[in-house]
């Protein structure tokens, strides 16, 4: 399913036709350039690689510079791949804009969540902790993390202190409230992961079909 790359600008409130206030996230989406086209015959699957955001050549590695020069395209800072059922409708250098979506569509949004640094188990995993009085030294500790004799190891996935946040997070079935093609803006109902200016990947909802079929070859 095709999508677009964008940048989170923040949240605001808009009003619908009946005067109801709706909290929306504003994303500057695109324009994105098709950097590569993959197909079943050559690559074993159908996909396109989109590039977003200008970048100076001195900030890129040599393999990246070679890729852009081979395609005769301007360097892009962010590259993301989008799987498709059929990639034959796309060509290298083609530009995709936010108008591939329309108000009322449902989308999936992926981005890095806000990093919270090192956190304990109570903040990171919502543990209850221990007693807070009567001479307790347990307080905010994790408690037992396994058994001595069996399995004699810590199970994979056990909640432990560590780096909280800064993970790829996807929220599904968010509704598009408004599109402003002249400003490359898309307004999404509710909140999305990540900090302001964070890079966002937007795709058609995988689990919910849109009422009207969009033309993805604009």
Curated annotation (Swiss-Prot):
GO terms for molecular function: rRNA binding; structural constituent of ribosome. It holds the Pfam family Ribosomal_L3. Keywords: Ribonucleoprotein, Ribosomal protein, RNA-binding, rRNA-binding. It comes from the Bacteria. The lineage of its organism: Bacteria, Pseudomonadati, Spirochaetota, Spirochaetia, Brachyspirales. SUPFAM superfamilies: Translation proteins. NCBIfam families: L3_bact. It comes from Brachyspira pilosicoli (Serpulina pilosicoli). PROSITE patterns: RIBOSOMAL_L3. InterPro entries: Ribosomal_uL3 (IPR000597), Ribosomal_uL3_bac/org-type (IPR019927), Ribosomal_uL3_CS (IPR019926), Transl_B-barrel_sf (IPR009000). One of the primary rRNA binding proteins, it binds directly near the 3'-end of the 23S rRNA, where it nucleates assembly of the 50S subunit. Part of the 50S ribosomal subunit. Forms a cluster with proteins L14 and L19. GO terms for biological process: translation. The keyword rRNA-binding applies. The keyword Ribosomal protein applies. The gene is rplC. One of its GO terms (cellular component) is cytosolic large ribosomal subunit. This is Large ribosomal subunit protein uL3. Belongs to the universal ribosomal protein uL3 family.
């Amino acid at each position: 399913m095709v999508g677009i790359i964008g940048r989170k600008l923040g949240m605001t409130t808009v009003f619908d036709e009946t005067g109801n206030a709706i909290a929306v996230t504003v994303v500057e989406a695109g324009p994105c350039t098709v950097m590569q086209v993959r197909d079943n015959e050559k690559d074993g699957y159908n996909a396109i690689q989109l590039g977003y955001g200008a970048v100076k050549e001195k900030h890129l590695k040599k393999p990246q510079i070679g890729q852009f020069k081979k395609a005769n395209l301007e360097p892009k800072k962010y590259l993301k791949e989008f799987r498709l059922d059929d990639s034959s409708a796309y060509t290298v250098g083609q530009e995709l804009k936010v108008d591939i979506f329309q108000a009322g569509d449902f989308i999936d949004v992926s981005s890095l969540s806000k990093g919270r640094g090192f956190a304990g188990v109570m903040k990171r995993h919502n543990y209850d902790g221990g007693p807070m009085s009567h001479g307790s030294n347990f307080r905010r500790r994790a408690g037992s993390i396994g058994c001595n004799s069996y399995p004699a190891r810590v199970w994979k996935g056990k909640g432990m202190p560590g780096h909280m946040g800064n993970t790829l997070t996807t929220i599904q079935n968010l509704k598009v409230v408004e599109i402003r093609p002249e400003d490359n803006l898309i307004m999404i109902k509710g909140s999305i992961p990540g900090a302001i200016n964070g890079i966002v990947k937007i795709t058609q909802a995988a689990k919910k079909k849109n009422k009207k079929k969009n033309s993805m070859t604009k």
